[in-house]
Amino acid sequence: IQLTEQKTNFARGRLIEVVKPAAERIQPHCKHYGVCGGCHYQHMSYDLQLRAKRSILVDQLSRIGGLDGILVNEVILSPAQWNYRNSLQFHLHSQGWLGFQERGSNNLVQIQECFLPEPALDTLWRQLDFEPEMGIERIEVRCGAEEDLMVVLESSGYELPEFSVDIPLSAVHLSPVGEIVLAGDDHLMMMVDKHPFRVSAQSFFQVNTAQASVMVNYLLEKLPLKQNSTVLDV
């Protein structure tokens, strides 16, 4: 390991060589892993990932928050390890291809595969085709409750991009002048534990819909609620 940053009570480094792999070290699922900055734990078994995330939380509570002796329960596993995200955000290269930021830099990595988006999104982003120098900087794709699809085009310029669709979806352009609907609706309907949520193009929503349902039910079970209580996610 080569140290890249040294602080008083922690350090950062980058992997140079694996001399002897740990028993739980596995082959990453994605060919872009290690270069793409999106995923950090694909070299770990899923069980080890959960334990590592819990360990990181305990460390941050203690080292940063000064909270020692806090009981941190085991991490509740996700119903799906892959293809669980209802949204994905790409950067658009000036040559017209989609990419993610390279790990540790602002360079872009051209993406041929990603195992995080829901199946409908995975099909959608591969069908997107952009011309060079469109003035679009970021592309977000979203998937709603009934596999309704949305494409969000973000730019810092004021010019409206040329855009055409061959499949049923909603498209929204975000720029300094505001939000302009190019096709379909300005929102998607998301469903969490049979509760509908109207989510606009600029709204945050939990990216793992199935795990959001698990989280909501866990909180409802643990909170001291009365029959007429109202719970808000804010």
Please state what every model-predicted region is:
Residues 1-234:
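Accessory RNA-recognition modules of RNA-modification enzymes
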